[in-house]
């Protein structure tokens, strides 16, 4: 689990310039230095550890966490750590209605599967060069926007977001669907729209990587607990099974006595 040293080394305490802030973040600010707000890391570590446990427990219950972060500093880490914990992700562009109009999104994912099937069975080669080119372009476009959620068969149970200001549409959709939002909140963010906030820098690459890494670790820890629980569970014995085993034993005994 994250330590104070981790937070300091990754620059989690550096907020935005003092002229770019949300007054609702006042309670998370330690002070100001050279025109930059400094985030109170004592609060950060407390919120971080609490949220880690929330995410771990959600994963232990088999819940799905959607990773969202489309800006340059976040895209690579979002994909890397979502894949490490087997969760869906959006790291290219958030399409409006990705959750509130999920049925349409699933239709687009199906189109991607159709194009891939045409490539696999060779039927794409029966088209004109222009048709094949247009299909392949469409495939690349669909992969970029939907590749990270192509295996997401239903809406996620929770959303982990990097930069709630940039990803305001994703957060608004999650809020509308009453889907819990987990997110680092920088000094320019609105903490009221996040269910499980972690005060911290959401711009620096190392800080973003730390948040993604910790969420992935929490999920993998939760999955391990779930696997352990399932392994320990013994299937309950029905009366019918008891009667069947008794009858079988009696039948074997009768056979041996003959």
Swiss-Prot record:
InterPro entries: Ribosomal_uS2 (IPR001865), Ribosomal_uS2_bac/mit/plastid (IPR005706), Ribosomal_uS2_CS (IPR018130), Ribosomal_uS2_flav_dom_sf (IPR023591). GO terms for cellular component: cytosolic small ribosomal subunit. One of its GO terms (molecular function) is structural constituent of ribosome. Pfam families: Ribosomal_S2. The keyword Hydrolase does not apply. Keywords: Ribonucleoprotein, Ribosomal protein. GO terms for biological process: translation. Residues 222-258 are annotated as: Disordered. NCBIfam families: rpsB_bact. Belongs to the universal ribosomal protein uS2 family. This is Small ribosomal subunit protein uS2. It comes from Campylobacter fetus subsp. fetus (strain 82-40). The gene is rpsB.
